[in-house]
Amino acid sequence: MIRHLVLFKLNDGVGRDEPRVLAGVEAFRALGGQIEDLRFWECAWNISDRPIAYDFAINSAVDDADALKRYLEHPAHQAGVALWREFATWVIADYEF
């Protein structure tokens, strides 16, 4: 199994309640039911007020590297990425477990 983690940081001046952000969140929340290769899927807003914290997180799992590739290339995932690219940056980590 491969764990796929993503941490998002909203760009300066961007708020969680902006329509484009809400659309991005909904697009990612829906992925768990849209992409068959996902074995585990959760995403949520950060609840910590620590200055080093990121704003939004995705925690997911797939069977193997091929499944991860299919997930990353899936049109629904690509559509969500296109939305988030407009208002955030992110870091990722993928590891076997």
Swiss-Prot record:
One of the Pfam families matching this protein, by short name: Dabb
Q: Which InterPro entries match?
A: Dabb (IPR013097), Dimeric_a/b-barrel (IPR011008)
Q: Top-down, what is the taxonomic lineage of the species of origin?
A: Bacteria, Bacillati, Actinomycetota, Actinomycetes, Kitasatosporales
User: Where does the record place the Stress-response A/B barrel domain?
Assistant: 2-95
Species of the source: Streptomyces coelicolor (strain ATCC BAA-471 / A3(2) / M145)
Q: Which SMART domains match?
A: Dabb
**UniProt-recorded name of the protein:** Uncharacterized protein SCO4036
